[in-house]
C-alpha cells in the first residue's frame, strides 16, 4: 500500500510508531490476554497507565508542582463552559480576546454564564490578516480572568507571544491545536486546556492544566463532570474516563520524549512550516492571507489563483496520497494541518506535488 499523509485538522495523524505498537497490543495488552480497552479504569494496571501518562506529560511541558493535570471529557467546547463555571467566582465578567473562529466560539458559550468583555484583536497589516500584539490588549479591571486562543485552526492565525500581564491576571487559553508543538511557560497561565485530537492523541480526551489555587471556586450549578475540584479529587476518574484515548495519548507522550521532547519537536515544526510557506510565498499560483508574524505553524491555509481548480487539486492530491487538504467551509481553499505527527517527508511530498501541480495548471 502506498504511503498516505493525512493533513486533517483533527482528528489528526498519529505517529506511525504509536499506531504500530497499539496494533500489536490491541488484543493482548502486557500479557493479560485482554485489550487495554477492556480493563477496569480502577484496576492497578490502568492506574499505572494513567500515572505514567500524567508524569510524561508533566515532564514534556515542565509543569510546576502547584498545577494539577486533569484528563477530561467534553473537548474544547466543553471547556468553553468549564472555564467560566470554574473561575468566575462572585464576578460577573471576564476578558475574552477575539482573534478568530474558535475564540469567537468560546465567547458565544461564555455569554451563557457572564457578560464577557470582548477584546477585538483582529487587524490587517499590509492587506494580510493579523492580531494586535498583547501590549495593545485593553484588559478590564473587574474581569475574573482573561481568555484567548493561541492558534486558530480555521484561520491559520497564531499568537506566539507569552502573556505577561502580572500576577493578578488569571490567563486561560485554548491550546487544543498547538500544545506540545513548542516550549510553553505553564507558570504564566491559570488554566490551559486542549482537546486531544490534534497533537495529543485520538478524539474523546481533553487535558486541563489548572493552578491549584484556582480550585474550589466552581459555581454551585457547575456540572460535576466539569468541576475541576471534583475531577482533581477523583484523579480524573469521577466517572469512567476514555481509557483507550488516555492509553494512546500516553504512548504519544513516550514517542515525543523519544524524539527529543518539545524543544526538538519545535525545531522540526519550524522546518516543516518554513518549507510549506516557502513554496506558497515564492509562487503567484498559491497565496496565504495571514501576516508572517501571525502565521500558524500547525495549520496552513492557502488559496489557488483560480478556485475553479480546487476540485482538481483535491482529487489529484488525494490520488497522490495527500489526504484531507480541503479548507474549512468558512474560508474555503486548502488547508494543510502539519501537527507533531506529520513527518517532514509528508510536507516535502506536499510541496513537491504543489510545485508540479502549478507547472501543469498554472
UniProtKB/Swiss-Prot annotation:
Family under the similarity heading: Belongs to the class-V pyridoxal-phosphate-dependent aminotransferase family. SerC subfamily.
Names of required cofactors: pyridoxal 5'-phosphate
Modified residues (N6-(pyridoxal phosphate)lysine): 198
Cofactor binding mode and count: Binds 1 pyridoxal phosphate per subunit.
Superkingdom of source: Bacteria
Function, as annotated: Catalyzes the reversible conversion of 3-phosphohydroxypyruvate to phosphoserine and of 3-hydroxy-2-oxo-4-phosphonooxybutanoate to phosphohydroxythreonine.
EC number(s) given by UniProt: 2.6.1.52
InterPro entries, sorted: Aminotrans_V_dom (IPR000192), Aminotrans_V_PyrdxlP_BS (IPR020578), Pser_aminoTfrase (IPR022278), PyrdxlP-dep_Trfase (IPR015424), PyrdxlP-dep_Trfase_major (IPR015421), PyrdxlP-dep_Trfase_small (IPR015422)
Pfam families, sorted: Aminotran_5 (PF00266)
Family annotation (PANTHER family): PHOSPHOSERINE AMINOTRANSFERASE
One GO cellular component term noted in the UniProt record for this chain: cytoplasm
Locations listed in the record: Cytoplasm
Keywords, in A-Z order: Amino-acid biosynthesis, Aminotransferase, Cytoplasm, Pyridoxal phosphate, Pyridoxine biosynthesis, Serine biosynthesis, Transferase
Catalysed reaction, written as an equation: O-phospho-L-serine + 2-oxoglutarate = 3-phosphooxypyruvate + L-glutamate; 4-(phosphooxy)-L-threonine + 2-oxoglutarate = (R)-3-hydroxy-2-oxo-4-phosphooxybutanoate + L-glutamate
Transmembrane segments: none
Pathway, per record: Amino-acid biosynthesis; L-serine biosynthesis; L-serine from 3-phospho-D-glycerate: step 2/3; Cofactor biosynthesis; pyridoxine 5'-phosphate biosynthesis; pyridoxine 5'-phosphate from D-erythrose 4-phosphate: step 3/5
Major localization class: cytoplasm
Keyword Protein transport: no
Binding site for pyridoxal 5'-phosphate: 76-77, 102, 153, 174, 197, 239-240
Organism: Salmonella paratyphi B (strain ATCC BAA-1250 / SPB7)
UniProt name for this protein: Phosphoserine aminotransferase
Taxonomic lineage from the root: Bacteria, Pseudomonadati, Pseudomonadota, Gammaproteobacteria, Enterobacterales
